[in-house]
Amino acid sequence: MIYGIGTDIIHIPRIEQLINKYSTKFINRILGKNEITIYQSLSIKQQTNFVAKRFAGKESVAKAIGTGITSSLLLRDIEILNNNLGKPIVYIPNAAKILLNNIKLTEYKIDISLSDDYPLAIAFTVISASI
């Protein structure tokens, strides 16, 4: 059963402006520890696209959960990493798992698709669940 669907689209130049203005403070607010390691290994252009896709992805995950970003579910707490084939995989913290369990989701799967084509990045998330 589909529990939730979320999507988000972002203007990449907006992310570029925020990175230029706030630098590390902005990155630390958006990316998790594992994502920061990946971010630091990328070229400047790749970094901006990486952050834009992660920002859109995290927003779409929060929308699919049904809460949006809240004090118990921060952007940096959701990590979107890639498997060895490049497929994006969503990792969520215990707080989000507790939130999903509180709304009676005992078994769930989060699928996400990320794409960027300058000047836009988009994410689409589907949460499938057993209730």
UniProtKB/Swiss-Prot annotation:
* Principal location class: cytoplasm
Q: Which NCBIfam families did the record assign?
A: acpS (TIGR00516), pantethn_trn (TIGR00556)
The UniProt record gives the binding positions of Mg(2+) as D8, E59
Q: Which HAMAP family match?
A: AcpS
Xref: InterPro entries: 4-PPantetheinyl_Trfase_dom (IPR008278), 4-PPantetheinyl_Trfase_dom_sf (IPR037143), ACPS (IPR002582), Ppantetheine-prot_Trfase_dom (IPR004568)
Q: Which GO terms describe its biological process?
A: fatty acid biosynthetic process
According to the UniProt entry, its GO molecular function terms are: holo-[acyl-carrier-protein] synthase activity; magnesium ion binding
Source organism, top-level taxon:
Bacteria
For whether the record's keyword set contains Transport, the answer is: no
Q: Which GO terms describe its cellular component?
A: cytoplasm
**Compartmental location:** Cytoplasm
What are the EC numbers?
Answer: 2.7.8.7
Q: What does this protein do?
A: Transfers the 4'-phosphopantetheine moiety from coenzyme A to a Ser of acyl-carrier-protein.
Keywords for the protein's UniProt record, in alphabetical order: Cytoplasm, Fatty acid biosynthesis, Fatty acid metabolism, Lipid biosynthesis, Lipid metabolism, Magnesium, Metal-binding, Transferase
Required cofactor names = Mg(2+)
What organism does the UniProt record list as the source? Answer: Orientia tsutsugamushi (strain Ikeda) (Rickettsia tsutsugamushi)
What is the protein's given name? Holo-[acyl-carrier-protein] synthase
Key word Lipid biosynthesis present: yes
- List the catalytic activities from the record: apo-[ACP] + CoA = holo-[ACP] + adenosine 3',5'-bisphosphate + H(+)
Q: Give the record's family classification.
A: Belongs to the P-Pant transferase superfamily. AcpS family.
